[in-house]
Amino acid sequence: WGLSAINASSAYARGATGKNITIGITDSGLDNSHIEIDASRLSSDSALSYSNYIPNTRQKRHGTMVASVAAGALEKSNSTPMHGVAFDADVLFVAIQLAEPDPDYDPVDLGDDDGSGNVSNAPDFTGIDNFFKELFEIYNDLNVDIVNNSYGYSGNIIDYTEAQVRYAFPKTIEEMAQSGVSDSDKTIYVWAAGNAGGYADQGVNYSHPELLPGMAHLIPEIQGHSIAVVSIDEGGEISD
């Protein structure tokens, strides 16, 4: 029902199967022997391990699932009826080490904004900012068409200001903006809107995207190619 929910058949009727498209996926690991992701469709620029550590089977599950939903093969030996949305697309996978969600909701601290754009008492995000800048530089330099990001930080975007976000992530924003690249050629960044629904019993308002997926709400230069997405149930209702 998922393919029907996104009207995939209309795209297929126009010949849009993912052919000649590369999907970037950043996640904790990928089983590159999985039947859904044929080795011939996995970019040689992929990085399947991190910090000289190879992800274990558990760490590969989520990334393998995401890759299968995005680009799982149409034709395969076991004739399973499942296939990915863009079943002819290539995949460039970058594995990064991800932490387990905290049991308690703990929104990230971006310091204090005095209302005039001046930020104080902010933690040092230089290392994290450099990391994301270098990560997105990989996709941009390789002209990857679209990138899936199923990770992030706790904290509703409406609880932050433009000044706070720019202060914490200047290089990330610059890389995502892709200045000098025509809109039609920019890499599109797709984000899971967030996992705050898991903290509903703690009174968290989860009706807004979290920090990274919601960044385009505050940063004009990444609007149009940074997208927050949600999951829905079979009735079309946004999942909890």
Show which residues each predicted segment covers:
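Short coil-to-helix leader/linker segments, especially the first N-terminal amphipathic alpha-helix
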Residues: 1-9
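Residue-level detector of conserved, well-ordered beta-strand and adjacent loop positions
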Residues: 38, 43-44, 51, 213-216, ...
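Soluble or luminal CAZymes and related metallo-dependent hydrolases
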Residues: 3, 123-131, 164-169
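Substrate-binding/specificity loop regions of serine endopeptidase catalytic domains
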Residues: 82, 152-240
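Subtilisin-like serine protease catalytic core
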Residues: 9-46, 53-127, 140-145, 156, ...
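Solvent-exposed, polar/charged alpha-helical surfaces in well-ordered, non-transmembrane soluble domains
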Residues: 9, 23, 64-68, 133, ...
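Short, solvent-exposed secondary-structure capping/transition elements
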Residues: 4-5, 79, 133
